[in-house]
Structure formats: C-alpha cells, structure tokens
Amino acid sequence: MAERDHYHTIDDPNVPCNFYDTVNLTGHRLFPNGSYDYYGTIVPAELVGTYDYIHSSLTERIEVREHVRGCVCKFKSCLNICCPWRQVFNSEVDGCIIDHTDNRTWPDPPMLNITFRNESTILVNMFTQFAIQSFRPCPKMFSLQPETSSWDDYLLFENGSMLRVDDKLLIRKNEFCMVPTYVNESDMFYTIHPANCDMQDDHSTVKIINSYAMMFSIPFMMLTIAVYLLIPELRNQHGKSLVCYLIGLTVGYSSLCYVQLYQVDATGVTCKVFGYTAYFFFMGAYMWLSVISFDLWHNFRGTRGINRFQEKKRFLFYSLYSWGIALVFLAFTYCAQQLSNLPDNLKPGIGDGVYCWLDMSNWAAMIYFYGPILAIVVANTIMFIMTAIKIHGVQREMARIIASENSTKNLRTEKDKFGLFLRLFLIMGITWLTELISYFVGSDKGWSKLFYISDLANAMQGFLIFMLFVMKKKVKHLITNRCSSVRDGSNQRQSQYSTKTTSSSVANLSLHEKPSVEKPLVISSSVDPQKTTIFR
C-alpha cells in the first residue's frame, strides 16, 4: 500500500539517526564538548551516537563492536564511495583492498560535475562539496561509463542523489556509490563514475514495479466508485461508506505512484504535498473501514440508539469521524516532522529531503502508520467476530420461534451485507498483513518471495473489490436497469419532441388557412389518389 522499500534494514531506536546518514568517527578528533572533527566538518555532540552494527549492504546488517558514528549527512550533503579512497573492490576476497600492482593514477582532487537546484552545472571538488561515506549498496554492481555509451549518461545533484538519464530514474544516495573506472586497459588515469546495483538487486526498479502494481488497482476502484454513485439503489449507508473508503485508497495510491514514477524532487514542496496527501487519504480509508465494521455490528445490536438520526445525519457523523481523525493524524505527523528537538529516528520522514513517504528504515513508520492501522484492524476484527456471534444467535432464535417473512428477509439482507464486507475486510487484511511483515523482515532475503505476494496483493485488490461489489448478479441487474431507463428516457424525450413538432406544424397550418364551413379541408393521400383524409 505504501511506497515500501523492499530491501531495507531497520535501525535501533536508541541511535540518533539512520545508519545511512552516518560516518565512522573512530580515530577522528574529539572535542571537550562531545563534538567531532570529520575532515574539517564539525559534527555536534547531539548528532553523535554509539552503534554496535553496520549495514554491509542495503539488505544485510552485521553486528560489530561498539563504535562512534556521527550524523554528518543531516547538515551536509553526503556522497557515497564504494570503497575507501585509493582502494578497489576485489571479488576474490569480497572486499576492498589497496592494489599495489595497479599503476593507474587517481584523480587528485577528484572533480565532479554537479547539477544544482537552479539547474546550473558546476565542476566541484568531491571532497569539499560532500561529506564522503564509504558503503557498497549491493553485492553485484556495474559502473556507468558515459564515454562509451549514451545509455550510461547521468546527472549528480547537490544532495548526493543521481538521475539515470536513459530511464529517468532518480536514485537515492544510499542506492549507488562512486567508483574509479577506466575504459581501456592502456588508460593510465582513473575516472570517477557512479556504480549501480545489478538489475536483480536494483531496489529503485523494484519500487517502480510496485508502483505499476498499484496503478493496476486504480481503474477498478474508480469504476466501482462510478457504479455506486450512478445507481440510486446502491447509494445507501453501506454504499456511500464503500465509496469514501475507495476514494481514500484511490487518491493515496495515485499520490504515491506520481511521486515514484515522475521522480519528484525529495527536497521540494511537491514532494511534501503528495506525501502528506497520500498519508491523509490512506488513514481516512482505514477509518472508513472501521465505520463499515461498526455499522454492520450496530445493525445487529439489540438496541438502535443511533437510529434516531436520519441516514443523512448518520453519514455526516461518520464523515466527520473518519476524515476528522485522519486530519488529526495528519496534523500530529506534520508537527512531529517539524520538531527540531525530536530525534530523527522518531520523525516520520515525509518530505525530509530523502523520502516523500514515510521513512521505512527506522521505527517511525510503526508509530505513524502501521501502529494506528494495527489498532484499527484489531478493533475491526473484534467487531466482525461480535457481529458473527450475533448473527448466529439471531438465527437460532428465529429457528426456535415462528418468524415472520419480513424478519427472515431482513436477516437475510443483513447477512448478505455482512458476508460481503467480511470478504472486503479479508482482502484488505491480507494486503495489510503482507505489508506489515515486509516492513519487519525487509532485510531478510529469505522472505523475499513475500514481497512479490505483497505486490500481487496491491495489484489485485482493486480488481477483487470490483468483482466483489460490481460483478454481483444483483448489481449487474441494477446496472442493466439503469442503462435501460436512461435509454428509454432518451427515446421518450425524442418521441415527445417529435409529437410536439407535429402538433406545432398542424397548428401553424390551421392558422394560415381560412376555415370554410361549406367546403372542408381535403388532403389527398400520397399512397392512393382515390383515398382522401378530411379534417374538419
């Protein structure tokens, strides 16, 4: 449902920031106030923490001896190099080494063309423009070499991200690294270029696929919304609640797809607008799911306290509840992101310059998204169970006594509604469950097949909802009747127009002719000249 990072490792809650925003401060100068000097950049004490692990790649977290790291990327743009400077990756040892047999010259200083926000491109010193990190995102990587192929053209931005020009894919700083390259064996100088993950490990590509999976659901949701708005018989309490629920999902999915597919700048206002829009409508959708659960449960209660309200007033109450609570969550999330004294691992991460959606690499997503949804799903489950128990009790009671035909019909109708929305709840429950599990085990390759199940659930849920709520025999019958009534109404209007035109012609004819008492008006028939029609 969300812009998930299938291949992420979650940081500990007690560290000051995401591992990918840190550098190792071991051996660097420590000041009495707790700050560190990292190659001329002062890292303040509040952005220094102790880590007992490292991320050896985007998918692996390794426990190591405690060491000090600083969140230098929080106040200076970082750029990632695959190996420490003047070292190269050796596949035999699966690590970085100093190759003493290599006589090529390293650039000193390394100069890079950087594109800035004003779209100007400037040649800058890599070491002065960026804080340098050393991290290899994936086991298998390939370097871009624009000297040999225009397909490898790229743009480096001032925030450390990169745009692959060929497929317009914006890649975050922790998903690629800079590497020394050469074109020919005879070349005596290294050139610094980015290296991408191999296609099977290309996390940005995986997220693009997930976006298309979500897009597959959107048309079916829109069709379902249209049917329930156009058919008067479906515009009851449950139908309107379903429409609001689907509107929330549709807008949420559309916002995330736009951000992902159009490579929205993570530092711009557009990123924040779409990120918070998606958050608000997703939360609103789940609140409407709880409304549906409550309304079903309420209809089977012995008392009917809320039934004193008319249906319009009840729908207004439900609307204020669902969208109002979603608005409260939105305000809470936005304020948390703006608090300067709140640790970064507790901030939602929406529009923070890296993400347009929630930061899935720490526990913030649990606080602002998965936690509230978990509470809603648990409450819905309880209400569905209570409703099922009540239905069973009513059935037994009606079997014991002689029930009227109306009572039996009403019970059957409510049971049908319950069964229908129970299936909806199961569809959403499975989707939500796979999302939650993928969040917790995102760095474990053994669970990688679950991600495909989650993508499939995202792709299929709109289609399943359409089949469940539109392709029912009763709804198809209503659609047929609606189309027939529209067609009949059009024919009737055409007939009325023709009749009115004929009457008008006859009236005009009567006005222009002088009536004669002795001599009636005779119109000869065009079919048979012997026959005549007389109008008096």
From Swiss-Prot:
Name the InterPro entries on file.
Answer: GPCR_2-like_7TM, GPCR_2_secretin-like, Methusela_ecto_dom_1, Methuselah_N_dom, Methuselah_N_sf, Mth_GPCR
Q: Which domain of life is it from?
A: Eukaryota
Pull the Extracellular topological domain ranges from the record: 263-273, 336-365, 439-449
Q: Where are the transmembrane segments?
A: 212-232, 242-262, 274-294, 315-335, 366-386, 418-438, 450-470
Q: Which cysteines are joined by disulfide bonds?
A: 17-71, 73-78, 82-177, 83-96, 138-197
Output the GO biological process annotations, alphabetical, semicolon-separated.
cell surface receptor signaling pathway
Q: Where is this region: Disordered?
A: 487-506
Q: Which residues lie on this side of the membrane: Cytoplasmic?
A: 233-241, 295-314, 387-417, 471-536
Q: Which Pfam families match?
A: 7tm_2, Methuselah_N
Sorted alphabetically, the keyword list is: Cell membrane, Disulfide bond, G-protein coupled receptor, Glycoprotein, Membrane, Receptor, Signal, Transducer, Transmembrane, Transmembrane helix
Intracellular or extracellular location(s) = Cell membrane
For bias type Low complexity, the affected ranges are 492-505
Gene Ontology terms, MF aspect: G protein-coupled peptide receptor activity
- Assembly and binders: Homodimer.
- State its role: Involved in biological aging and stress response. Essential for adult survival.
Q: Which PANTHER family is this protein grouped with? A: G-PROTEIN COUPLED RECEPTOR MTH-RELATED
This one is known as G-protein coupled receptor Mth2
